[in-house]
Amino acid sequence: MTRLVLIANPGTKRCEAYCRAAVAFGVMPVVVPWAEVIPAGGCLDRLGAFDEPAVVRMESPGKDTAVTRLLLAAGDPHTDWQSVPLPKGVLLHPGLQYQGFVRVLQGLRKSFDARPHLRPTACPLAVARMFDKNATLADLRAAGLPTPDFLSPEQLAGSTPLLDPDRWRVTYLKLNTGASAVGMLACRHTPAGWVGTTTILHRDGEFSNTRRVRTVTGADLSECVAFLSREGVCVQKGIPHAQLDGQNADLRVVCVGGKPVATIFRLSQHPITNLHLGGRRGDWQRCRDAIPTRYWLDALESASAAAGCFDSLVAGVDVIFEPGFRRHSVLEVNAFGDFFPGWADPAGRDLYRVEWDAIMS
């Protein structure tokens, strides 16, 4: 029987959901905590789970304070991160956390290369690339795929203003290496000035992530922009959402082996549609019926091509349709974009089973 090793944070929803699914399709995964992989810099020499042939899946390292500290230490080993307060939700040097994660992923790549008996479901360097929104957009644009206009690294490093109504009157600013809409700021220019919709909360000198989408203006908005700029920002032209069921809509396309296997409509009254931020899954058939088949197939083709830009079995591709559905853009590609409890294909398989069947085929 094929062995499965899961690098994850035990006890988190993602880890538990995957383990339950694996047991259901007849595989008992061996869970190796990120807390054991990160301090070793991705070196697997002392981790016996990797000595024998196995499929290796990496799960998100999020939702674990101890792991956050380890990532910070991997990014800056000269600071005693254990003594630094880390209240729940606080965005503590997210750019540095990413630097630490990249170093670990680089180490994992070397470890996998030295162990041909292991079959990682994603190249660690592809995971790092997908987490870098600016790099991802550049890759997608180079592949000829439709994306929002965005500021180049040269513009971000220069004196180009991040918000300029003469450039874009609707502008999205995101933590360049964030996930799940952490550090998201959607701005629109009004006669009274810029108004932002955000998941960032600034209080007592600290910036936190909040699940309560809120509106910011004036000095509060400026502080959020300054925070994003310090930590590494992706700045995109805001694209108007197509409306479904009277709400803003976009689409998550989960690709397995470069092929779309799941499409989830996300609807929200806000410009930020993530399901954990008040968005909801749209009724699939009703939403699908609203989109002419030609434009639907065009979007799926773009999602497939976007996933194909990265060496990963699984990619969650975010696609936005403009009003009328004739035009679409690829917004992001998510390395860990397959967590949709309750989804099933016509054969009754959940996403994890679909992925495992692809591995075994």
What are these regions (language model features)?
Residues 73-89, 197-208, 278-282:
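A solvent-exposed, charged loop/short amphipathic helix patch at secondary-structure junctions
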Residues 1-5:
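Extreme N-terminal starter segment of soluble prokaryotic enzymes
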Residues 276-314, 321-361:
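C-terminal active-site "lid" helix and adjoining low-complexity regulatory extension at the edge
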Residues 9-23, 28-154:
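Conserved N-proximal alpha/beta basic substrate-recognition cap immediately N-terminal to
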Residues 10-11, 36, 154, 177, ...:
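Short, flexible loop/turn elements at secondary-structure junctions
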Residues 252, 318-320:
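Short, surface-exposed charged micro-motifs
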Residues 166-275:
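Phosphate-binding site of ATP-dependent enzymes
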Residues 144-145, 167-169, 308-313:
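Short secondary-structure junctions
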